[in-house]
Amino acid sequence: EVTDELRRLLKEFETELAILRGRVDGLEARVGELEATQFSTTTKLKGSTHWVLGAAKYHGKGSSQQAAANGGTSFSYDLRLALETSFTGKDSLVTRLRSGNMDNIYGGNGVGLFGQEYGVNTDNAVVIDRLFYSFPVGDEFTIVGGPRVRMDNMLPVWPSAYPSDMTMDFFTYAGAPGAYNLALGAGAGVYWQTEGGFSVSTSYLSGNGNLSDPNTGGIGTDGAAFSATTQIAYAPESWGIAAAYTKASGTNGTGLYSGNGTVGAVALSLSDGQTNSYGLSAWWTPEESGWIPSVSTGWGLTDISDSNARYVSSATTQSWYVGLEWSDVFLEGNSFGVAVGQPTFITEIDVKGGKNESDYLKGGGYAWEFFYKFQVTDNITVT
């Protein structure tokens, strides 16, 4: 029953009610338009691209030859498109497409250590870069696996606060390219992670898991190019520590990438032997931006055994790095970073054929970088 008082109120606020009805109708129309044009109700599309313009200047022995082969200015790109699908709200099916044309210094041509994290070359073809599925088991366990999964996709914690999307490739391996080799292939892993920040993970993958010939590929075969990793980490909100162990086979391709070590260390890791790698990492991030940077550091050691290299039976290599990043430098969203370290170098070696060990222990140099990232818009940065 509409009382006189209610009629009076309706008449008094008639204009406001009409405005509200119009706004509701407008919102319903917009929601309908979004539902009609949205990509998917279960899938998110994420994309990123790097455009790189630059050149390198060479110094030292062999610089004239390097300049003649890779001394020009280049302009190239890296493109990534990721489709993330969830069927239950807790699981995730990741399909990532990638394309690039960095057949230049940024892809590791000439001096491998100058290779960048984004330095991929697919000759402009679009390839399936990732294809894996993860789902929870209970409240604390997660299983991850797929035909194109990378080692770090199966880790609950990445042991570094230093950015990995704009830097030299070496500085994206937490100082231990042997333990965190970022091997890619067919595999699976499981991890346990508590709300308090403690986690344990283990995984196995085959770099040639798509092949059925056990001599050149397969899973669990001599030709599998396998990589098995176990990590223990404790990572509360603003800091963390981690220890990792990886056993890998250099057979058919699993080993250090050229941007992660000296020529000798990379060659030995790719020989038909076994590697046992260890990594220790720690990182800390300040609660507020300011003069104090985030600090990340890591150290790695790799034992190489049963090598089929012509003059080497076994060897030991080491590596380390320290990375600092300041947030909101000059303007909110901008950042400045600097990193220094030693890419993987040989520290001990067992040679044969009358060779001199000292000839193989040379060349353990240093790598360093600094960057300033300017946030032009929410989605565009210039570094």
Residue ranges and their predicted role:
Residues 1-66:
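N-terminal periplasmic/intermembrane-space "pro-region" immediately following the signal or transit peptide
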Residues 42, 48, 54, 68-209, ...:
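Outer membrane beta-barrel
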Residues 245-272, 281-283, 294-383:
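Outer membrane beta-barrel transmembrane domains
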Residues 61-69, 116-119, 173-176, 214-218, ...:
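Extracellular loop and loop/strand-boundary signature of outer-membrane beta-barrel proteins
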Residues 59, 105-109, 155-159, 163, ...:
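Outer-membrane beta-barrel and related beta-rich outer-membrane complex signature
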